């Protein structure tokens, strides 16, 4: 019987995929197809929630099949992320206008990312205090116990590592290993490796311009191929969003969410407030924040459903260049740095809120100014090297909690609402990187304001 029901669910999913394909054949815009997929995915997931239990075998098996589309799409994006970072960063160095302001551009982008992460930590602290979020009374079930075991294993490798050692881990000892994403800090290690190649290119360009020009032409060819691969993968975005949203909604435990409702509410209030701060920073830079919101919404939608900052990177770069008018070099830097440095959601708000929740359980007053200032500083510093894939928030939280000498068990106790909160965190991460790129480009006079201010006519070109 279960097999029949699973077959029906999968058949409905395939019909919905067929509808999206029909819309594509009728040249319906990319935005409309993505939003249609988002809405239909939520509706389908809610229907499955109503008919079955989230933990039922039918839902579990159906979600496994849905994952072929949703998770398969995310894996394709993750497949291209490391090559894209490597080629994008090196390509940024080969742009003449970038080499003149290299230190200023990279410093400004990183500075904005770290600053906004510190602000995000303060927002998370305020939300925790305002909603009186506490770890008291949280119960540990089977899922939490299993998660706690994994967290403790991961903590063992982090606990004995000092802050200088953590910073040393950012340096790539084997760049080819890091290109596989084998370490939590692999992303930023690839960024550093690519930056060294770029700096070497600048030196070669001064002494041996012919060899440098040959390298540049080869790199341009590789970059064109990588971006073509990105385009091919991005065509699948509506289908991926449909499956991911249906899977997430269908598998969500409503009862568990209600038990941690205060934490979920406080988290989303903090995320929304921080997103508004992004818009305020854009407005203070002399740009229309509504225009920004309209142009990046499809990217944020995908980040929300996929829960992968790294997976959203191709869309991130494309949106910065084609929609916001950000120069290619700055867009490449901002997107690449943004998946490993200063993630406002995963490395900012989340660790700060967990620290505020657990501090009273060990006799610490979380509202003491000294504790708050120390926590903000630790969060900002610890935001270096957080992976832009699943588990990055856990890694950031473990570093912050261990540095503050706080219990790490809280990380496991909120597992039931982790997927729900992670969607919002990821969207904020991506918004933070695009905000850093936009503000940097504006301040350095490299923003094409005509592109930024014009109506969004290029949306469909992302998947063309």
From Swiss-Prot:
GO cellular component terms given for this protein: plasma membrane
InterPro entries: Na-dicarboxylate_symporter, Na:dicarbo_symporter_sf
Regions that span the bilayer: 3-23, 34-54, 73-93, 107-127, 184-204, 225-245, 263-283, 347-367, 371-391, 395-415
MF annotations from Gene Ontology: L-cystine transmembrane transporter activity; symporter activity
Gene3D superfamilies found in the cross-reference section: Sodium:dicarboxylate symporter (1.10.3860.10)
Main location: membrane
Membrane topology: Multi-pass membrane protein
Localization of this protein: Membrane
Entry keywords, A to Z: Amino-acid transport, Membrane, Transmembrane, Transmembrane helix, Transport
Family: Belongs to the dicarboxylate/amino acid:cation symporter (DAACS) (TC 2.A.23) family.
Role according to the record: Mediates uptake of L-cystine, the oxidized form of L-cysteine.
Entry protein name: L-cystine uptake protein TcyP
């Amino acid at each position: 019987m279960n097999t029949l029901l699973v077959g029906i669910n999968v058949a409905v999913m395939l019909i919905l995929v067929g509808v999206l394909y029909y819309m594509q054949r009728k040249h319906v815009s990319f935005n409309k197809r993505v939003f249609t997929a988002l809405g239909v995915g939520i509706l389908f997931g809610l229907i499955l929630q109503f008919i079955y239990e989230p933990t039922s075998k039918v839902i579990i098996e159906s979600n496994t099949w849905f994952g072929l589309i949703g998770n398969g799409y995310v894996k394709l994006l993750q497949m291209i992320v490391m090559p894209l970072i490597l080629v994008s960063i090196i390509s940024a160095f080969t742009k003449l206008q970038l080499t003149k302001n290299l230190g200023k551009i990279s410093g400004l982008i990183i500075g904005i990312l770290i600053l906004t992460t510190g602000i995000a930590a303060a927002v998370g602290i305020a939300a925790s205090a305002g909603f009186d979020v506490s770890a008291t009374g949280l119960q540990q079930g089977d899922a939490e116990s299993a998660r706690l075991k994994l967290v403790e294993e991961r903590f063992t490798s982090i606990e004995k590592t000092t802050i200088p050692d953590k910073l040393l881990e950012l340096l790539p000892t084997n760049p080819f290993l890091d290109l596989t994403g084998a370490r939590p800090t692999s992303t930023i290690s690839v960024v550093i490796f690519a930056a060294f190649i770029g700096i070497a290119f600048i030196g070669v360009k001064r002494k041996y311009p012919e060899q440098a020009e040959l390298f540049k032409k080869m790199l341009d060819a590789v970059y064109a191929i990588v971006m073509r691969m990105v385009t091919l993968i991005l065509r699948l975005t509506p289908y991926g969003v449909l499956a991911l949203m249906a899977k997430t909604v269908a598998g969500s435990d409503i009862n568990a969410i209600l038990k941690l409702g205060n934490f979920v509410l406080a988290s989303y209030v903090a995320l929304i407030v921080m997103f508004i701060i992004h818009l305020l920073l854009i407005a203070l830079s002399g740009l229309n924040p509504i225009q920004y919101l309209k142009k990046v919404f499809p990217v944020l939608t995908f980040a929300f459903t996929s829960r992968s900052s790294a997976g959203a990177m191709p869309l991130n770069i494309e949106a910065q260049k084609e929609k916001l008018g950000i120069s290619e070099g700055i867009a490449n830097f901002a997107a690449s740095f943004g998946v490993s440095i200063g993630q406002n959601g995963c490395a900012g708000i989340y660790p700060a809120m967990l620290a505020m929740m657990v501090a009273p359980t060990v006799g610490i007053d979380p509202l003491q100014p000294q504790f708050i200032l120390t926590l903000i500083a630790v969060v900002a510093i610890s935001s270096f090297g957080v992976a832009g894939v699943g588990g990055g928030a856990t890694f950031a939280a473990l570093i912050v909690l261990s540095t503050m000498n706080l219990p790490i068990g809280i990380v496991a106790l909120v597992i039931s609402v982790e997927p729900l909160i992670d969607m919002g965190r990821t969207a904020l991460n991506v918004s933070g990187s695009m905000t850093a790129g936009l503000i940097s480009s504006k301040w350095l006079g490299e923003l094409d304001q005509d592109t930024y201010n014009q109506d969004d006519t290029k949306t469909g070109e992302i998947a063309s």
